[in-house]
Curated annotation (Swiss-Prot):
Organism: Thermosipho melanesiensis (strain DSM 12029 / CIP 104789 / BI429)
Database matches in SUPFAM superfamilies: Metallo-hydrolase/oxidoreductase
Keywords: Hydrolase
Keyword Hydrolase: yes
Disulfide bonding pattern of the chain: none
Protein name: UPF0173 metal-dependent hydrolase Tmel_0315
Length: 223
């Protein structure tokens, strides 16, 4: 299984199926300019903010992908012409043809800006994706004790940029709660407002005995 970081909170996961998480492509200063997306089977959207719902509508149409998100976002996307959606909610677990997926809690917002309107985007979340390995994408979130309830996480994708999400120290505490085999930092240094030192995070995480892999946009990890 290959995990590719595409800047900000965008990840591509390739196994038997290909998953794109939080597809913020256009306008993403961290997206690698020469990167060409492969065919996408599933698009996972953690919440409705523009830097996460991103280019979902266009990409779902281009690839014929199924979008998995919360109920409200799926309804919104259907109104925008997305044909294949699968709505879930926090705590929901579903056995798909690729494996089991759970939507996890996140402490954040989820309003969708549509023109001059802000549309209710349901509850923000994360995803626990069980393939050959278990991948946890936390979404945008503050530190929460719910993370202690996660079990068997092989790879955790955690925001560290502060201001809107956990900072380095809270993300380290999240690692203590989750106890993953590997952690990859995300949602940092896209803009000055979420600047963070990934090497500081790595040093603190590895003192806990957990492997930390810092991926530059466009780089991949095989697990």
């Amino acid at each position: 299984m290959k995990i590719t970081f595409l800047g900000h909170a965008v990840f591509l996961i390739e196994e038997k199926r290909t998953f794109l998480i939080d597809p913020f492509i256009k306008g993403n200063p961290a997206f690698p300019s020469n990167y060409i997306l492969p065919d996408i089977d599933y698009i996972l959207v953690t919440h409705g903010h523009g830097d996460h719902i991103g280019d979902t509508v266009e990409l779902a149409e281009k690839y014929g992908a199924t979008v998995i998100s919360n109920f409200e976002i799926c309804n919104y996307l259907q109104m925008k012409g997305v044909k294949k959606v699968h709505p879930m909610h926090i705590g929901g677990v579903k056995e798909f043809e690729f494996g089991k997926l759970k939507m996890t809690p996140a402490l954040h917002g989820s309003g969708i800006i549509d023109g001059n309107n802000i549309i209710y985007g349901g509850n923000p979340g994360g995803f626990l994706i069980n393939l050959k390995k278990s991948i946890y994408h936390a979404g945008d979130t503050g530190l929460t004790k719910d993370m202690e309830l996660l079990e068997g996480v092989d790879v955790a994708l955690l925001p560290i940029g502060g201001n809107f999400v956990m900072d380095v120290n809270d993300a380290v505490k999240a690692v203590e709660f989750i106890k993953p085999q590997i952690v990859i930092p995300m949602h940092y240094n896209t803009w000055d407002l979420i600047s963070a030192d990934a090497n500081e995070f790595k040093d603190k995480v590895e003192k806990l005995g957990v492997k930390c892999v810092i991926l530059k946009p466009g780089e991949s990890l095989e697990v």
